[in-house]
Structures are given as C-alpha cells and as structure tokens.
C-alpha cells in the first residue's frame, strides 16, 4: 500500500510540474523553452501510471485521491495559499476513496 501511494505521489508531482510549467508559459509569459521540461515531466507522468498492476481505469480512479492531496500541498507550498477547512475536510475523503479502490483491486 505504501509503495502504491508513493508511486501515486511521484506521479502526481510529475503531472502537476508539467502542467505548471505550461501554465507559466501561457499565463506568465515564461520562455517557450519551459515547454521542454514540461513535456518530459508529462511523459514521465504517463509512464508512471503504467507501472500499476491494475486495469487503467481503476488506476486512474485511485490516483485521483492522491492527486487531490498533492495538488493541495502544491497550493500551500508553491502558490503560498492557505488551505481552507474545506480543503482539510476534502483531502481525507479523497484518500479514503483511493484506499477503498486500491484495497479492492487486489481482490477482483
């Protein structure tokens, strides 16, 4: 379970970094060269999703819970935005959903 969660966390970071670098280029006028590491990060994100031993749709569904929590961590650390009570309440709910799906994929 820990290995799966850590893999999901690294996967989420790759997705967020790739999207963030693209966002910097579009919204903040960053150099077009930022698209190269963005593309590499997004390619790594896709590859990491293939490392799970479950059907792709199930992996994507479970990954969503960890993505939500990672995005909230990014919001706080990188964007410098304080988390709200709704963020703090929603994150554990998302993780519970991920946990239910991951535990279940070993039993089907």
UniProtKB/Swiss-Prot annotation:
Entry annotated with the keyword Membrane: yes
Topological domain spans for side Cytoplasmic: 27-30, 82-84
Protein name: UPF0060 membrane protein YnfA
Record SUPFAM superfamilies: Multidrug resistance efflux transporter EmrE (SSF103481)
Record bears the keyword Nucleotidyltransferase: no
Cleavable signal peptide: none
Topology in membrane: Multi-pass membrane protein
Subcellular locations according to the entry: Cell inner membrane
HAMAP family in UniProt: UPF0060
Periplasmic compartment segments: 1-5, 52-60, 106-108
Regions that span the bilayer: 6-26, 31-51, 61-81, 85-105
Entry keyword set: Cell inner membrane, Cell membrane, Membrane, Transmembrane, Transmembrane helix
InterPro entries (alphabetical): UPF0060
GO cellular component: plasma membrane
Sequence similarity: Belongs to the UPF0060 family.
């Amino acid at each position: 379970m820990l290995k799966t969660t850590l893999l999901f966390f690294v996967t989420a970071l790759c997705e967020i970094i790739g999207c963030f670098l693209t966002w910097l280029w579009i919204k903040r006028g960053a150099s077009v060269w930022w698209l190269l590491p963005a593309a590499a990060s997004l390619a790594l994100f896709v590859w990491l999703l293939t490392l799970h031993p479950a059907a792709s749709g199930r992996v994507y569904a479970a990954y969503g819970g960890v993505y939500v929590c990672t995005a909230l961590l990014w919001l706080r650390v990188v964007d410098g935005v304080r988390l709200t009570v709704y963020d703090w309440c929603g994150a554990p709910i998302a993780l519970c959903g991920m946990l239910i799906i991951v535990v279940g994929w070993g039993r089907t």
